[in-house]
């Protein structure tokens, strides 16, 4: 049968071609200018906190290995609190369970804001950092498990090398004087935030034991009241500084105490309280365009407390390990626990993050932003291998505070974080000249509208 001219033309017509102005999707682009400013402010605050964190850890190590080390351990193990409520804890435990809940409260605020109002609410911008963070959790966990596969006792520490310490990482950036472009800083912070979310989930599901249903259910009452008041009177709590301390803080403390009594690690309460805070302003208050929401206001109020007090005190009580001289250090580093942690953080993190990012770019036919090369992703991936605060916490949950494996795990965490910081320094310092050019490019505003051109190009692309 002969095809008609119309049918033949339809059959023979070439496949549609993409529009001439179509561009491949960019990975590690600049995102929005507002998000860049916000994250830049967060990282500047974390730089000071990171310096305090490192100083606290160094002081603890020196004190724990000095002739007066007994006084350090006596201070760390000194108990205080109300025993009938199961709250008679050592100072070290108060730092881990209590003060660190403030850190996780901020994590909850940051996570909710990123997924409600930040760049992560857009799938095309969130898929790469979220997937890279997942790869940066999975590969280190597998490497640690492979090293400790024949020891069920030490295998419990598989989650130790999964988290990234953003405060420590940005402190390293400040020390080496890196001009890391904002797009890479945003990528690093996003990795750390998603890492924290995964770590919180791991702590809640794998490191909670003897869960008591009654206090857990009771905790829902103050938590629900806290959420209702924060949502209903968000403008009031944002405008009146002391109101949140007088009304919301007691509800938060009761929630924390009941979660602690339930057997679930109390830091999870901090995350839940952070999730309960509204991100956007209500319509009655002018909506999102009228100014920062309650979550951002609380973040400004609590970040100095977290970065300047809570996390450094936790590091002080957690990082103090009696190494026992060079012989003791060698023994600690020969433990499969320490070997697994070092290999997981120094090798597993870069492999997981960079490998996942590379696979995604190939699978989606995306490309890196023209300002960056794969060596830049590698440098940031090395920085992500600095696992400190959450890693120290998971080590204590895995092996018990002050146990031999716990001490060896902490030595491994410290050694791995130091090694990752040194390697990241070598890579990123070598690229500083290119980063300075990118930094200058970020300042160009040819149309004088207050928004640098790179962010406008990003939004149009």
From Swiss-Prot:
GO cellular component: plasma membrane
Compartments where found: Cell membrane
Region described as Disordered: spans on this chain: 1-23
Main location, first listed in the record: membrane
Gene3D superfamilies xrefs: Na+/H+ antiporter like domain (1.20.1530.10)
GO biological process: one example: regulation of pH
Lineage top rank: taxon: Bacteria
Catalytic activity: Na(+)(in) + 2 H(+)(out) = Na(+)(out) + 2 H(+)(in)
This protein's name: Na(+)/H(+) antiporter NhaA
Biological source species: Arthrobacter sp. (strain FB24)
């Amino acid at each position: 049968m002969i095809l008609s001219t119309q049918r033949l033309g339809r059959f023979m017509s070439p496949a549609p071609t993409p529009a001439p102005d179509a561009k491949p999707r960019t990975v590690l682009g600049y995102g929005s200018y507002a998000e860049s400013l916000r994250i830049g402010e967060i990282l500047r605050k974390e730089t000071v906190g990171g310096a305090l964190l490192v100083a606290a850890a160094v002081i603890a190590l020196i004190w724990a290995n000095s002739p007066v080390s007994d006084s350090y351990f006596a201070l760390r193990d000194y108990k205080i609190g109300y025993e009938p409520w199961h709250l008679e804890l050592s100072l070290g435990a108060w730092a881990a369970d209590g003060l660190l809940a403030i850190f996780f409260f901020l994590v909850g605020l940051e996570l909710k804001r990123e997924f409600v109002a930040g760049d992560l609410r857009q799938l095309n911008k969130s898929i790469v950092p979220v997937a890279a963070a997942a790869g940066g959790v999975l590969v280190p966990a597998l490497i640690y498990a492979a090293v400790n596969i024949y020891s069920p006792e030490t295998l419990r520490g598989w989650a130790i090398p999964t988290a990234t310490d953003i405060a420590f990482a940005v402190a390293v950036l400040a020390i080496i004087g890196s001009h890391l472009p904002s797009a890479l800083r945003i990528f690093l912070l996003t990795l750390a935030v998603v890492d924290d979310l995964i770590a919180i989930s791991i702590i809640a599901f794998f490191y909670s034991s003897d869960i008591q249903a009654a206090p857990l259910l009771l905790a829902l009452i103050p938590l629900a009241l806290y959420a209702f008041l924060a949502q209903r009177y968000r403008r009031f709590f944002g405008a009146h500084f002391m109101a949140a301390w007088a009304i919301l803080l007691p509800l938060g403390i009761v929630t924390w105490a009941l979660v602690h009594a339930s057997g679930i690690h109390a830091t999870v309460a901090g995350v839940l309280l952070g999730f309960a805070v509204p991100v956007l302003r209500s319509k009655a208050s002018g909506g999102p365009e009228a100014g920062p929401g309650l979550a951002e206001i609380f973040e400004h109020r609590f970040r100095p407390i977290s970065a300047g007090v809570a996390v450094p005190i936790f590091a002080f009580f957690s990082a103090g390990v009696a190494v026992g001289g060079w012989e003791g250090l060698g023994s600690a580093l020969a433990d499969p626990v320490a070997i697994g942690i070092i290999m997981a953080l120094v090798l597993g993190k870069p492999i997981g993050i960079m490998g996942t990012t590379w696979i995604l770019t190939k699978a989606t036919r995306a490309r890196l932003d023209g300002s960056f090369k794969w060596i830049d992703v590698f440098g940031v991936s090395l920085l992500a291998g600095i696992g400190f605060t959450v890693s120290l916490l998971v080590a204590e949950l895995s092996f018990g505070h002050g146990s031999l494996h716990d001490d060896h795990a902490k030595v491994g965490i410290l050694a791995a974080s130091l090694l990752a910081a040194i390697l990241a320094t070598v890579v990123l310092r070598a690229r500083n000249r290119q980063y300075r050019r990118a930094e200058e490019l970020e300042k160009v505003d040819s149309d004088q509208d207050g928004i640098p051109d790179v962010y406008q190009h990003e939004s149009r692309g």
